[in-house]
């Protein structure tokens, strides 16, 4: 008898649980978001001449936030936000050019640090499912702004200064899924590609007085990251 009552109670709890989103539902999500830049290294030029140097940004993980508004059970609008991502940028000098010019080995050295915010607005399409598992596809637009760009101590001593990265405007595509825990709470996982391209500019001065390179440097960086999120959501 006790087992039967328990089964009935469980069935009753499931019967009152809607497995679909409705028009007007608003979901706030929070959790971990990782930005993983493209592994390709960006070339560097000085006054228009290519140098035997490349650079690459590192991954970073921050607190991610999502705000999702549903127009019906299939269509929703999502805004992606996060605390500022903090990327270390590494210099690659396989030929030893910096060592021969400045007597400083900068190969695979931490060149700089930069912060960025990549707010993204996406249209989401949720597939019809009769279960608590809700897969979706998303297409959106992204605007990434870079700030607090700075060289580390060693490159600064070699004359690198005035680092600046242009803001970027591009598209985003994503694949994700919600797992509904009850009427309010859900788990969310997503993977998205964001088209982020920026131009980094900087100055190079002969601060060590060794007859080193002097001029204006430039690098076109195709960051184009994959962005992975694991979040807990609450529906209002």
Regions found by a protein language model. Give the residues of each.
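Cleavable N-terminal export/targeting peptides
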Residues: 1-24
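Extracellular loop and loop/strand-boundary signature of outer-membrane beta-barrel proteins
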Residues: 49-53, 104-112, 156-163, 214-220
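Predominantly the C-terminal beta-signal and adjacent terminal strand-loop region
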Residues: 86-90, 100-102, 182-236
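Outer-membrane beta-barrel translocator domains and adjoining extracellular loop/strand segments
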Residues: 40-47, 89-96, 147-158, 200-207
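Transmembrane beta-barrel strand/turn architecture of Gram-negative outer membrane proteins
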Residues: 168-179
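Short sequence motifs at beta-strands and strand-loop junctions characteristic
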Residues: 55-61, 111-118, 163-170, 220-225
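Gram-negative (and chloroplast) outer-membrane scaffold detector with strong preference
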Residues: 19, 23-25, 34-36, 66-152, ...
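Surface-exposed strand-loop-strand hairpins of Gram-negative outer-membrane beta-barrel proteins
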Residues: 36-63, 159-167
